[in-house]
A protein has these predicted regions:
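Short beta-strand segments
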Residues: 9-11, 60, 111-114, 144-148, ...
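Left-handed beta-helix
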Residues: 4, 205-349
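General beta-strand structural signal in soluble alpha/beta enzymes
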Residues: 59, 82-83, 112, 143-145, ...
Length: 349
């Protein structure tokens, strides 16, 4: 039985679609996006605590964010904050954490999650993860959490579920699907067995290490060499030398789409990847004109369907805008139509 629950939190992204709030020096996972007094990574840790103590949580992040992680999660052991010398996508990031966990926790049962998503119904989230952990505790199985779609979304990948297993709520995965066009997304919604891929995975340590050895032998051999230095003074130098030699590849391409033992647990817990200003607007409280705001004293006159985020400013006044983003951070101001928000990446360069 794999009953030693561990959690891996991926926190290396730069959140470029949320400029100017999110910057390469201080990306969105470390920001109080919702105006609740907690950053997204702190909210992630908070909702996982009933499942797993902080001492059993691991954060994988870019070297330059290590200081921020230590500040925001002060009770996390320093050994559990893993530094990526450079971004190599999610497969090397997850493999590094799993190999390090395995060295001290051979019976680990693991949850992998992004750091920058939002969950509204935390008790249902905890129930779903506990169910998945129970399934993987004694099986050679990878469980991916599928989010029941509420709309024909073109910004997410999808999981196609096949036949149910003998365990209630858990289905075999038929296929992973790339981000669809609108027509295909509408077909997925109508079919009823397609779910959003939230990037939340559950597996035991032997299942994932065997899968990586089978489908990504080069990655496994690099990890084996790195592991010789884990928990020693040489670790930083060895990881700094070897990690950048890993192929840049996502865990979906590296393992999920190849493995035979993939299952999904469809869920509804108010999930959003907070991938855009538009998605943030829909999740924040709105006034009767559809405006959402985060800040101390934001006054809107004759405005409709706007999102205003200016937590640093003592007073902001906006008049006469319809469907706009107004965001200020560290002396940088963005005023942009929500219809054009896909261009924000280039605006922030």
């Amino acid at each position: 039985m794999y009953n030693d629950i561990q959690v891996i939190i991926m926190a290396g992204g730069v959140g470029s679609r949320f400029w100017p709030m999110s910057t390469p020096d201080y990306p969105k996972q470390f920001i109080d996006v919702m105006g609740v007094g907690r950053s997204l990574i702190q909210l992630t840790v908070d909702r996982l605590k009933p499942i797993c103590p902080v001492e059993n949580m691991w954060v994988v992040t870019n070297e330059k964010y290590i200081r921020i992680v230590k500040e925001q999660i002060p009770d996390m052991p320093v050994d559990n904050i893993l530094s990526e010398p450079e971004a190599r996508n999610t497969a090397p990031c997850i493999a590094y954490a799993c190999w390090k966990i395995q060295k001290k926790h051979p019976d680990a049962n693991i949850v992998v999650t992004p750091s920058d998503a939002l969950v509204i119904n935390t008790s249902e989230y905890q129930r779903v993860l506990s169910k998945a952990l129970s399934y993987t505790s004694d099986k050679n199985a990878i469980v991916t959490i599928g989010i029941k779609p509420s709309r024909p979304e073109t910004g997410y990948g999808y999981i196609a579920a096949a036949e149910p297993t003998s365990v209630d709520e858990i289905y075999k995965v038929e296929a992973f699907k790339e981000k669809p066009n609108l027509e295909t997304a509408e077909q997925y919604l109508a079919a009823g067995n397609y779910y959003w891929n939230a990037g939340i995975f559950v597996w035991n340590i032997d299942t994932i290490s065997k899968a990586i050895r089978t489908y990504q032998p080069n990655l496994a051999s690099i990890m084996d060499e790195m592991a010789l230095s884990f928990y020693t003074e040489q670790e930083k130098e060895v990881v700094g030398r070897l990690f950048p030699t890993c192929e840049k590849i996502s865990i979906d391409y590296a393992v999920m789409e190849k493995s035979k033992e993939i299952y999904t647990l469809p869920a509804e817990f108010g999930w959003s990847d907070l991938g855009s200003w538009g998605s943030l607007r829909t999740l924040l409280p709105q006034d009767e004109a559809g405006n959402a705001k985060v800040g101390k004293d934001i006054r809107l006159y004759e405005c409709k369907n706007c999102v205003v985020h200016a937590a640093d400013e003592s007073k902001v006044v906006v008049q006469g805008l319809n469907g706009y983003i107004v965001a200020e951070k560290n002396g940088q101001l963005l005023v942009c139509s929500l219809k054009e928000e896909q261009r924000i990446k280039e605006f922030g360069k």
